[in-house]
Amino acid sequence: MSIGLIGRKCGMTRIFTETGSSIPVTVVEVIPNRITQVKTVETDGYRAFQVAYGKKSSARVNKPLAGHYSKAAVEAGNALREFRLGNEELTEAKAGDELKVDIFKEGQVVDVRGLTRGKGFAGTVKRHNFRTQDATHGNSLSHRAPGSIGQCQTPGRVWKGKKMAGQLGNVYCTVQSQEIIKVDVERNLLLIKGALPGAPGGEVIITQSSKKRKEDK
């Protein structure tokens, strides 16, 4: 993982280009991420930043975390996340500094990770896009049933990973190579092209595109 930011998904809108074409964008609010720890090759074997996001009452922070925050002289956050760094990335930053939206620029492509909406228990038609069975011709109870899930005596079991009904959503998902359309430094907003995983108000993690990093090597 490369350097990134933790933000809050606000919702979707659209913006118009000079030629009049419409671009759907997701608005992400990035409250400044506070660096709580800097990991180095000498002490930890790799370079990374640990950042705190959001705010939390000091009464709700346990003693080990409270000491961790006070050592870095930063306010307690809702969550701690770690971003691994390259050899040349943000070499001057230190604990207590803030990371803001200006570490990204317009036109840059990023990967965004978020928790998808939970949709509860779902059947195979909704969950795995199975086709339905015949509406008539003797079928009266199995219109949305999955059908056979295995063979006979051999192998005598259902294979692991078989697509069946179950919990849908509420899993982490990463969308790759999403373009940043606009960076609003004054309001701490990123406008990212397309849809991002999760419900409005959910946490999203924005990092540099992994595919772009491979191309640059």
Curated annotation (Swiss-Prot):
PROSITE patterns: RIBOSOMAL_L3. SUPFAM superfamilies: Translation proteins (SSF50447). Residues 135-154 are annotated as: Disordered. Methylated by PrmB. The modification N5-methylglutamine is found at Q153. InterPro entries: Ribosomal_uL3, Ribosomal_uL3_bac/org-type, Ribosomal_uL3_CS, Transl_B-barrel_sf. Keywords: Methylation, Ribonucleoprotein, Ribosomal protein, RNA-binding, rRNA-binding. One of its GO terms (biological process) is translation. One of its GO terms (molecular function) is rRNA binding. GO terms for cellular component: cytosolic large ribosomal subunit. HAMAP family: Ribosomal_uL3_B (MF_01325_B). One of the primary rRNA binding proteins, it binds directly near the 3'-end of the 23S rRNA, where it nucleates assembly of the 50S subunit. Belongs to the universal ribosomal protein uL3 family. Part of the 50S ribosomal subunit. Forms a cluster with proteins L14 and L19. This is Large ribosomal subunit protein uL3. It comes from Coxiella burnetii (strain CbuK_Q154). The lineage of its organism: Bacteria, Pseudomonadati, Pseudomonadota, Gammaproteobacteria, Legionellales. The gene is rplC.
